[in-house]
């Protein structure tokens, strides 16, 4: 599980939500996952197309992040569910 921070994945995920993650090293195009890119961790939708691989926010005010071969990139897992952080006693 991972606590969401920021508004880039609204309206589906909000700050304080807890995302449930299935640990795996690959996900399908269009799925939401947890990614490591150049020292930062992201919850984003993966877009793998003819113009490149991108991490895409659901909130349209954020631009897609292109992934280059020279980047340090890792897939941590697929987001399989969520709940409000307040629904989990003791989870901060």
Indicate residue ranges for each PLM-predicted region.
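Acidic/glycine-rich C-terminal interaction modules and beta/coil loop segments
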Residues: 1-92
């Amino acid at each position: 599980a991972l606590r969401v921070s920021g508004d880039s994945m609204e309206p589906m995920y909000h700050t304080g939500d807890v995302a449930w993650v299935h640990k795996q090293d690959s996900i399908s195009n269009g799925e939401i996952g947890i990614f490591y890119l150049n020292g930062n961790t992201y919850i984003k939708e993966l877009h793998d197309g003819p113009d490149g691989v991108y991490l895409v926010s659901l909130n349209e005010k954020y631009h897609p992040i292109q992934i280059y071969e020279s980047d340090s990139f890792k897939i941590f897992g697929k987001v399989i569910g969520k709940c409000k952080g307040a629904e989990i006693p003791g989870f901060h």
